[in-house]
Amino acid sequence: MLFSNMKIRNGRVVALDESKDILYQNIPIHIETDVGEIREHKNGQTTFYVPYGYIKNTKGIDNEEIDCFIGNNPYASNVYIIKLAKADKEEKTFLGFNTKEEAVLCFLAHYSNQDFLGETTELSMQFFKSILYD
């Protein structure tokens, strides 16, 4: 199953119901911020252009569940991980993007300080799934 509990609205992937729990290529994700929603932070606010959440029951380098942005390609064969340059232990995972460039553009659209963009790693979806719960 590629998408479960999701639909395409105005060319964007969105959660179907208020639970905001989805499956993306059988990866369980909780959507914290959906398309069009705004998050406030100390430097202003960010409008989200794609769904953003976390991969359930995982632990990232920050010891919290793995943060992820969900692009519009349910068949994407690669995953992109961007390390935040201003944070030693924070990275964002990009699922559903066709290219590294698309993932980077999505990152830049959601961060007002472009200096946060750090190293980007590309993994095959198959390899990513094999190490996800290690």
Regions found by a protein language model. Give the residues of each.
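Hydrophobic N-terminal alpha-helices or hydrophobic patches in metabolic proteins across all domains
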Residues: L2-D134
